[in-house]
Amino acid sequence: MMKGIVLAGGTGSRLHPLTKVTNKHLLPVYDKPMIYYPLQTLITAGIKDIMIVSGRGHVGHFLELLGSGKEFGIQLTYEIQEGAGGIAQALGLAEEWVGMDNVAVILGDNIFQDDIQGGIESFESGAKIFLKEVSDAHRFGVAEVKGNKVLGIEEKPKIPKSNLAVTGLYLYDAGVFAIIKMLKPSSRGELEITDVNNAYIRRGTMEFAVLKGFWSDAGTFESLLRASVMVRGVYAISDRFAGPGTPDVESRVGDAKPGIRE
């Protein structure tokens, strides 16, 4: 079984002053709140049990917007992340909830055109990252690959070893939590997801897939605008971004109640 986690914390400082009044993941991307898009990525991949991790001041806003998930045919659980401990720390909060299941982790500001259902269905153990060819690789975590192996990941390198950016979508087995517990904070005082991924690489259990469609991390004004324009363009030729809760998404959860974990 695969569970899903949407990480929707952070201060959104690059989107001030908008994020002084709301969480950045609630800002509009074309005609829907940003968080609808990562949720849709998980839903179309067949994942129905999803946790949203956010800060104390924002969890209530997500609960008001999304509720139990019944409207979207899913079961939602909410987890509070105190402070800014990093992506890996936020993921670690879900250990009890995930149990022994595999988990798909997606950053709440990442928007994907690709359908990842095949990648999820073929995943069994270890870890898997999703890469995208970019022209400005120095802005991202960059994967060095050879054949079907990932040799390493370097965060925002001055001289990238490839043009393959590591997107904000990761698949892990339950062993990820033991790795997180062994991490030490980086120079910025956070537990880094790149360190988690490199641990799997050293074990030889990291897989990868290269995305073909549009991808954006809508964390700046420029990328937010670009994401809105691209979503609108995709709308014109398909229903890929119809979004959770639209008529094509059937409700299948019954009277599920949202769980808020603290």
Regions found by a protein language model. Name each.
Residues 2-6, 14-17, 28, 32-107, ...:
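Conserved N-terminal catalytic core of the sugar/cofactor nucleotidyltransferase
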Residues 114-139:
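Conserved donor-nucleotide/metal-binding helix-loop-beta segment in metal-dependent transferases, i.e.
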Residues 120-121, 149-243:
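Catalytic-core segments of class I nucleotidyltransferases/pyrophosphorylases
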Residues 243-262:
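Arg/Gly-rich low-complexity intrinsically disordered repeat tracts
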